[in-house]
């Protein structure tokens, strides 16, 4: 983790690490949810990170609209991730307390 990373990028990296740890656990996410849910969660976290890194590289003065669109994409991906977390809780793959913590990590990124 670089010292000059924006706080939101650091939070997105922490979210990705946490999400990969949870969804890679076969006891928590059995094989039947591997492709339908856990892979989607992992990919969505990587997408969030990518969009934030991309937005950080866009010049805010010359390409303000593109930067705003990229940040909006990241926020939309966070919304999708929140839906996957809720689904995980409803399927009893994670506890309410775990989902609450995970949701707070997503909120830190938004």
Residue ranges of model-derived segments:
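Amphipathic alpha-helical assembly/interaction segments
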Residues: 1-110
């Amino acid at each position: 983790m670089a010292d000059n990373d924006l706080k939101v990028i650091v939070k997105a990296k922490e979210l990705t690490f946490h999400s990969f740890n949870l969804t890679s656990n076969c006891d928590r996410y059995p094989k039947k949810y591997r492709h339908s849910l856990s892979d989607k969660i992992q990919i969505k976290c990587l997408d969030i990170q990518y969009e934030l890194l991309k937005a950080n590289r866009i010049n805010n003065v010359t390409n303000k609209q593109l930067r705003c669109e990229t940040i909006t994409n990241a926020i939309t991906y966070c919304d999708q991730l929140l839906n996957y977390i809720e689904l995980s809780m409803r399927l009893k793959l994670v506890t309410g307390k775990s989902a609450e913590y995970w949701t707070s990590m997503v909120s830190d990124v938004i």
